[in-house]
Amino acid sequence: MSLAETATPQENGLTGRTVFMLATGAGFAVAAIYYSQPMLGILVNELHAGVSTVGLVPTLTQIGYALGILLLAPLGDRHDRRQIIILKGVLLTLALLLSAFSGGIIMLLVASLAVGITATMAQDIVPAAATLSPAASRGKTVGTVMTGLLLGILLSRVLSGFVAEFFGWRSMFGAAAIMVLAITLIIWRSLPAIPASTTMSYPALLASMRHLWRDYKPLRRATLAQALLSVGFSAFWSTLAVMLHEVYQLGSATAGLFGLAGAAGALAAPLAGSLADRRGPELVTRIGTTLATLSFALMFLLPLLPVPYQLALIVVSAVGFDFGVQSTLVSHQSIIFSLEPAARSRLNALMFTGVFIGMAVGSALGSVILEFAGWQGVVVMLTLAGLGSMVVRWMSKKLHP
């Protein structure tokens, strides 16, 4: 039994206040990846760069996040996660300040990569919560922290859209730095130490991930299905602001409002966890991938509708696919966390590396397709990504991983 498993979570037990703190920390950290998306139209004008070049801002952020998860998150099994969370919080604050004071697109791109790498403190918080929580309430605790993380993803767009339009894009990055620093200080004062679960060296940790990937087919299936959904998820949100500006002449604040619709998807986290406990996570992944795909395909109807109904349909689609994507994500975490408790950080790192590679691909392809094939071309891409995830989840004859 690992050190993490023998640590006494009941003694270190998480109060409701501590769980809320961790959920807030995860939300603030992961939000840093998405602040740029609603302001892409503003960045095109103010930095005098092309749409495809500015599209590299969220792309590099997500690539940085994927690299940080793959190369840094496994350290959570080797070192005190509290120390890692605090260090990343300080570095993320500095990266956000660099974004705020960027003098041009090149500096902003470099800062975006740094933001992505350090924002992986969110992926240290989730397994930290799972380790500190007693087994009887672990699912509820992780679900609550994931709700904070998912709200951070979606509400970040709402906040960013308004702040960028009325106070400027630099103000948004500056405010984000203050929020991250504040929650980091609170975590420093409140979170207990978290014992390591292994004494393996860093090279051995990385090498063990290859064996985990090879040994666990459920991990591979979960990663592939979630990565495909992430392609569609990211392509939609990274191109929405530009499309709304070009087609409907709507500002970044309006684009941010669509994040409120998508925030409804965060409510799927506890609901999906509860259903997975009763009926098994495999069933929930099938429902989630199907709902996301149908919601993507619904936007093929846009050319047939008048403008007000087109906007309403986009809102309905956003609610539907976000609910499907987040339900599938929580169920996939339920699957992989049960595989090998002592390797939770590494298992989580492997799956989320795939997720954010998918997001980076979605951002990059979405921007290019929007520029050359329009919004309907983007919808084709979203639907194909959803269909791919459905194939992965429905190809199994079992309802359990």
Regions found by a protein language model. Give the residues of each.
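C-terminal transmembrane helical hairpin of 12-TM major facilitator-type secondary transporters
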Residues: 283-331
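Helix-loop-helix hairpin linking two adjacent transmembrane segments in secondary transporters
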Residues: 107, 137, 143-191
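Helix-to-loop junctions at the C-terminal end of transmembrane segments
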Residues: 69-80, 268-281, 370
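Juxtamembrane intracellular "pre-TM" segments in multi-pass secondary transporters
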Residues: 5-13, 191-224
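Cytoplasmic helix-loop-helix junction between adjacent transmembrane helices
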Residues: 112-149
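Conserved MFS/SLC helix-loop-helix module at the cytosolic interface between two early adjacent transmembrane helices
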Residues: 67-105
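Intracellular juxtamembrane helix-capping segments at the cytosolic ends
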Residues: 121-133, 325-340
